[in-house]
């Protein structure tokens, strides 16, 4: 599992490399022109709009340049948005098992979901047992969206640890 320190070191290194690649005047910051040129080089659709949007959101001190910290913030925000979108999709897919729509998955609902998804009865029981063993953190015989979300964060190592 990646630690926060390792994650931030990797983020800083990646940010420095990205800035270095686009920084034409060597000031360790990105101007609107440098960002716009980078988008054009990558054949990004509507580079001017993308550049203006990026600066509007992340040029925090409004000096017309993106610093290392501002770029790190942009990358981190993009990462969090993507991670949260993936988490929501994952939870929504699994919660198709919630047949009575009470925002809880029971063992029987999980078993039935696995059968509907192509497992035979024996496989479905094993999968439901495994799911409850891994995800039902409070042992109340139901899986909530929050339990599933927390499980996914840990299992898929979505966010760095301490």
Curated annotation (Swiss-Prot):
Annotated positions binding Ca(2+) 2: 59, 61, 63, 65, 70
Task: Name a GO CC annotation attached to this entry.
Answer: extracellular matrix
Where Ca(2+) 3 binds, per the record, is at 136, 138, 140, 142, 147
Under InterPro entries, the record lists: EF-hand-dom_pair, EF_Hand_1_Ca_BS, EF_hand_dom
Quote the record's binding site residues for Ca(2+) 1: 23, 25, 27, 29, 34
Disulfide pairs? none
Where does the EF-hand domain start and stop, copy by copy?
Answer: 10-45, 46-81, 85-120, 123-158
* GO MF annotations, alphabetized: calcium ion binding
Which keywords does the record carry? Calcium, Metal-binding, Repeat
- Highest taxon in the source lineage: Eukaryota
Q: What is this protein called?
A: Calcium-binding protein 4b
Q: Which organism is it from?
A: Dictyostelium discoideum
* Name of the coding gene: cbpD2
């Amino acid at each position: 599992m990646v630690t926060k320190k390792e994650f931030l070191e990797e983020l800083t290194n990646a940010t420095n490399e990205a800035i270095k690649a686009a920084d034409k005047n060597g000031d360790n910051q990105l101007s609107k022109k440098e960002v716009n040129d980078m988008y054009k080089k990558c054949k990004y659709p509507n580079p001017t709009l993308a550049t203006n949007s990026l600066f509007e959101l992340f040029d925090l001190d409004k000096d017309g340049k993106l610093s290392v910290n501002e770029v790190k913030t942009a990358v981190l925000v993009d990462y969090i948005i993507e991670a949260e979108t993936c988490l929501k999709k994952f939870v929504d897919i699994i919660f198709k098992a919630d047949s009575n729509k009470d925002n809880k998955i029971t063992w029987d609902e999980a078993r039935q979901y696995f059968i509907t998804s192509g497992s035979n009865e024996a496989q479905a029981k094993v999968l439901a047992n495994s799911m409850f063993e891994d995800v039902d953190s409070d042992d109340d015989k139901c899986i909530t969206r929050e339990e599933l979300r927390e499980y996914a964060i840990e299992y898929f190592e979505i966010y760095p640890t301490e």
